[in-house]
Design a protein with these regions (language model features):
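Short inter-helical turns and helix N-cap capping residues of alpha-solenoid HEAT/ARM repeat scaffolds
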Residues: 227-228, 269-270, 300-301, 336-337, ...
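Ankyrin-repeat boundary/"N-cap" motif
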Residues: 8-17, 39-51, 73-86, 106-121, ...
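Structural detector for internal amphipathic alpha-helices that build alpha-solenoid repeat scaffolds
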Residues: 13-20, 46-55, 79-88, 115-116, ...
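Ankyrin-repeat C-terminal turn/loop position
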Residues: 34-36, 68-70, 101-102
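TPR-adjacent "capping" and linker segments in tetratricopeptide-repeat scaffold/adaptor proteins
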Residues: 1-10, 188-195, 207-208, 223
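Ankyrin repeat structural motif
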Residues: 23-31, 57-66, 90-98, 126-127
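Amphipathic alpha-helical scaffolding segments comprising HEAT/armadillo-like alpha-solenoid repeats
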Residues: 36, 60, 72, 180-189, ...
């Protein structure tokens, strides 16, 4: 649990101070500035990683870990204890403390005790256990926070004590570390206690999808047929992950998943579930999958159209989309929803065959008021070897401070396209 006064305000290295303050944008800016000064030799983010963990800023710690922080270089006394992390209820904090490089620091007896602690929180309920520990009957302040790069959790504060509601996800993680095989039914129950953005949901889905066995597949099939759309939504994600984590397109459960999603796409009526189903078809542009996607090109819910746009591309071993897919991409690049436009432009870029109708529509997006659309259009045009990407990239300028990693991905395609032209120009 985190209590008021957890952190100190001592002056420190700017990167460490930014991590301790929870300023993610400043952390990224400082790392970029250090890269510039060192000509590409990235500043070691390990001390900032430790500071972020000490302050329970888990999303920043997750970012720093991805950017090269070395948990093994941090002494145990400079990190929160595993008990503190479990009590706090942050799956990301527990993940960081049990990173593969430092997992040996925890004997099995301690891991068993932490599993029992997580189970106690989970079974009691976060609110009830927080009230029991604080002895307060005051109103609980609730918010939703980003726990790691991908997932959110609930955060509750009462009587100066703050906890997160990720104990179910922590329990799943510790059980896996200990080699305990949790039943499919229990994992589904933990997921459905939360929503689709919560770590408990994604962790249960990933764990189940890695079980390439009849019991796990039967669980997905049962959820697909459920009357409750929330249960169907979890079933759709689970089915999609059976495909995502397949070793090959020919793997048994991959084939089953694609067939199930294709049939499901023609019958699902709930827009949220339908969007998840369609996302599962994005790797397969065969005739049946494409037909299932095209059926929903003009769906009234943007999330569904976005899934269609993301799924339409080229069939395997070809750079020529079908006429219907080609027309749908042109339509979706002019969609009123910005995210649909971006997804369609990305798929059109994947075709990379210089199609004039596609590239002209992409070029029209260079005048879009949002920078993220312009970036996607630059990248897509570069993939089609369309010289309009060069001037567009120049107009956009360098990546913005704090966004270099993301924006460089889009802009460097135009830079790569321009270099051969410069090398062959007379001079």
């Amino acid at each position: 649990m985190q209590t008021d006064g957890h952190t100190s305000g001592a002056a420190e290295d700017p990167l460490v101070a930014a991590a301790k303050a929870g300023d993610k944008l400043r952390v990224k800016q400082l790392l970029e500035e250090a890269d510039d000064r060192c000509q590409g030799d990235r500043k070691d983010p390990t001390a900032a990683f430790a500071a972020a963990l000490q302050a329970f800023h888990t999303e920043i710690a997750d970012t720093l870990l991805r950017l090269g922080a070395q948990p093994a270089d941090v002494p145990p006394e400079e990190l929160p204890s595993l008990r503190q992390a479990v009590d706090f209820g942050s799956p990301a904090l527990v993940d960081a403390l049990t990173h593969s490089s430092i997992r040996h620091r925890y004997p099995r007896t301690e891991l068993n005790a932490m599993r029992d602690l997580a189970r106690a929180w989970h079974e009691a309920g976060t609110e009830a256990e927080l009230r029991r520990r604080t002895g307060s009957s005051d109103t609980i302040a609730r918010t939703r926070v980003q726990d790691d790069e991908y997932c959110t959790v609930g955060e509750l504060t009462l009587a100066g004590t703050t906890v997160r509601d990720g104990h179910g996800a922590i329990l799943t993680h510790l059980e896996k570390m200990l080699g305990i095989r949790t039943s499919c039914q229990e994992l589904v129950a933990r997921a459905l206690e939360r929503d689709a953005d919560h770590t408990a949901w994604s962790r249960a889905a990933i764990e189940l999808s890695h079980r390439r066995q009849p019991e796990a597949w039967a669980t997905a099939e049962t959820l697909r047929a459920d009357a409750d759309p929330l249960r169907r939504l979890f079933g759709a994600e689970l089915t999609r992950l059976f495909e995502v984590f397949a070793d090959s397109h020919d793997e048994e459960y991959c084939v089953l998943a694609v067939a199930a999603l294709t049939d499901w796409a023609t019958a699902e009526t709930d827009p949220t579930v339908l969007a998840e189903v369609l996302h599962g078809l994005s790797s397969y542009q065969g005739p049946r999958a494409e037909a299932a996607l095209l059926l929903h090109t003009h769906h009234h819910v943007p999330a569904v159209r976005r899934a269609v746009a993301a799924g339409l591309g080229t069939p395997p071993h070809s750079r020529q989309p079908s006429d219907a897919a080609h027309q749908a991409l042109l339509t979706l690049m002019n969609d009123p929803d910005t995210d649909v436009q971006i997804a369609a432009c990305h798929s059109a870029g994947d075709i990379a065959n210089g199609d004039r109708a596609l590239t002209d529509t992409m070029a029209s997006l260079l005048d879009h008021p949002e920078r993220r659309v312009q970036l996607q259009a630059v990248h897509a045009l570069a993939r089609h070897h369309d010289e309009r990407c060069v001037q567009a990239a120049e107009r956009l300028g360098p990546p913005r401070p704090g966004y270099r990693e993301d924006e460089t991905y889009y802009l460097e395609a135009a830079w790569r396209y321009e270099r051969p032209r410069e090398d062959t120009s007379p001079g």
